[in-house]
Amino acid sequence: MGEMKYVCISCNAEIAPREKSTKFPCPNCGEVEIVRCERCRKLNNPYKCPKCGFEGP
């Protein structure tokens, strides 16, 4: 099986295996895993949950 690839929800960049990214459930609905790259985390780039529309920094 291949390694799971993650994409940043803010910038759509593929996340490198050793990058300091983060993954967490949507704070509002909890049904979608939000994945953010290190750059977007540091710059507080916004993201939007595709399921419920919640927007976060």
From Swiss-Prot:
Keywords annotated in UniProt: Metal-binding, Zinc
One Pfam family, short name: HVO_2753_ZBP
Motif (C(P)XCG motif 1): 8-12
Keyword Metal-binding assigned: yes
Residues spanned by motif C(P)XCG motif 3: 37-41
InterPro entries in the record: HVO_2753-like, HVO_2753-like_ZBP
Record-level Gene Ontology MF annotations: metal ion binding
Motif extent (C(P)XCG motif 2): 26-30
Motif residue range(s): C(P)XCG motif 4: 49-53
Residues noted as binding Zn(2+) in the record, renumbered to the chain: C26, C29, C49, C52
Subunit relationships: Monomer in solution.
Role, per record: Zinc-binding protein that binds only one zinc ion.
Free-text note on domains in this protein's UniProt record: Contains four C(P)XCG motifs, suggesting the presence of two zinc binding pockets (ZBPs), but only ZBP2 (comprised of C(P)XCG motifs 2 and 4) is occupied by zinc.
PANTHER family, sorted: SMALL ZINC FINGER PROTEIN HVO-2753-LIKE ZINC-BINDING POCKET DOMAIN-CONTAINING PROTEIN (PTHR40733:SF1), ZINC-RIBBON RNA-BINDING PROTEIN INVOLVED IN TRANSLATION-RELATED (PTHR40733)
Entry protein name: Zinc finger protein MJ0458.1
Biological classification of the source: Archaea, Methanobacteriati, Methanobacteriota, Methanomada group, Methanococci
